[in-house]
Amino acid sequence: MSFKPLHDRIAIKPIENEEKTKGGIIIPDTAKEKPMQGEIVAVGNGVLNKNGEIHPLELKVGDKVLYGKWAGTEIEIKGEKLIVMKESDVFGIIN
């Protein structure tokens, strides 16, 4: 991928929800909720603190994370859908 977020932004590849329930019912696209978890595929360098030093991000490429339902901006690069958001929009890392 040739996308590098700036400052405290990260790029996340959403992990799609199951298309079928445990009982075998197929869920149409219109009824699916927006995924709220994904894998980080790119991170910015960090933000400048009051002293002019760059404070690096805590998250790193490969982390699986939970984020807010309406967080970020959806983009598409080379056919791949990504969500770009600030690191602070992430709730936490999934182990």
Curated annotation (Swiss-Prot):
Gene3D superfamilies: GroES chaperonin. GO terms for molecular function: ATP binding; metal ion binding; protein folding chaperone; protein-folding chaperone binding; unfolded protein binding. Pfam families: Cpn10 (PF00166). Its main location: cytoplasm. InterPro entries: Chaperonin_GroES, Chaperonin_GroES_sf, Chaprnonin_Cpn10_CS, GroES-like_sf. Disulfide bonds: none annotated. SMART domains: Cpn10. GO terms for cellular component: cytoplasm. PROSITE patterns: CHAPERONINS_CPN10. The keyword Zinc does not apply. Heptamer of 7 subunits arranged in a ring. Interacts with the chaperonin GroEL. Together with the chaperonin GroEL, plays an essential role in assisting protein folding. The GroEL-GroES system forms a nano-cage that allows encapsulation of the non-native substrate proteins and provides a physical environment optimized to promote and accelerate protein folding. GroES binds to the apical surface of the GroEL ring, thereby capping the opening of the GroEL channel. Belongs to the GroES chaperonin family. This is Co-chaperonin GroES. It comes from Rickettsia prowazekii (strain Madrid E).
